[in-house]
Amino acid sequence: MDSKHSMISLKQKLSGLLDVIPKQSEIIYADYPLYGNVGDLFIMKGTEAFFKEHGIRVRKRWNPDNFPIGRKLDPNLIIVCQGGGNFGDLYPYYQGFREKIVQTYPNHKIVILPQSIYFQNKDNLKRTAEIFSKHANLHIMTREKASYATAQAYFTTNHIQLLPDMAHQLFPVIPTQQPSNQKLRFIRTDHEANQALQEHAEAESYDWRTVLSASDRRTIAFLQTLNVLNKKAGNPLPIAYIWEKYSDYIVQKAIRFFSRYESVETSRLHGHILSSLLQKENTVIDNSYGKNANYFHTWMEGVPSTRLIQHASKKENLPAHM
């Protein structure tokens, strides 16, 4: 199967979501990302594209900073939580928000979109499982086999599915220009970085923070502050609409940036996914706890022009299936 048909196939797999969010459903989008992690914005744009394609009506869009916890909701609304890689104890703010939603709305169907699950502390995993076990209509979408196995083992009373990342809904993504540079090294610099694997690629590398300008970062910080103040005033301002438009600009900026390069080497999962959506040759470097490798082995292994660096002894960038 060539790269194009591989991407089409992954997009088609997302139709499995319709089993739990049927066409024409009315939903609450509970925790859209209002921050500068551009990978999460690609997830959000894919999610919104999925809703639009299937006639799913979003009644309200909130985020963890302005969700009116405790507000009475129409019992027919499905509460939908953002997918990504922040399910676990590495990101307690977002994990805590999801748990609060599950506890506050025991009679609503709740769907967590495709997530990677990772807990450093098993006690934290057990505590989350205890909270989730009390909800009879909670559906957890996992985005790779390791997370699926964890969910099956610990969230035994919940409904579990395995689906690709929501960003695949965006295919095809059209490059904005012909490449003028050879290889982009797009390397993460935060606590998920795997230094042993990516040190060879860190020279002259970029990350989402360098794609965003100082002006972009100031605008995001301003909107985050405005979002909090807006909640205190009863949410009169259309923050979700303002952010939709501004995040469109950020996502297009990222597409333009990646379009300038022939190939990509990255330790960002969405650097890998965006490169694949653009049908660029790309190498993904595993992160600190195996998220990237797990995703690659679940969905991307065998996709032409994609490679994995998972072990320090295999930095020769050979295809993972060779």
UniProtKB/Swiss-Prot annotation:
Molecular function GO labels: transferase activity
Name of the top EC class for this enzyme: transferase
Protein name: Putative pyruvyl transferase EpsO
Induction conditions: Repressed by SinR.
InterPro entries tied to this protein: Polysacch_pyruvyl_Trfase
Its EC number(s): 2.-.-.-
Underlying gene: epsO
Lineage of origin: Bacteria, Bacillati, Bacillota, Bacilli, Bacillales
BP GO annotations: polysaccharide biosynthetic process
UniProt record similarity statement: Belongs to the polysaccharide pyruvyl transferase family.
Keyword vocabulary terms for this entry: Exopolysaccharide synthesis, Transferase
UniProt function note: May be involved in the production of the exopolysaccharide (EPS) component of the extracellular matrix during biofilm formation. EPS is responsible for the adhesion of chains of cells into bundles.
Superkingdom to which the source organism belongs: Bacteria
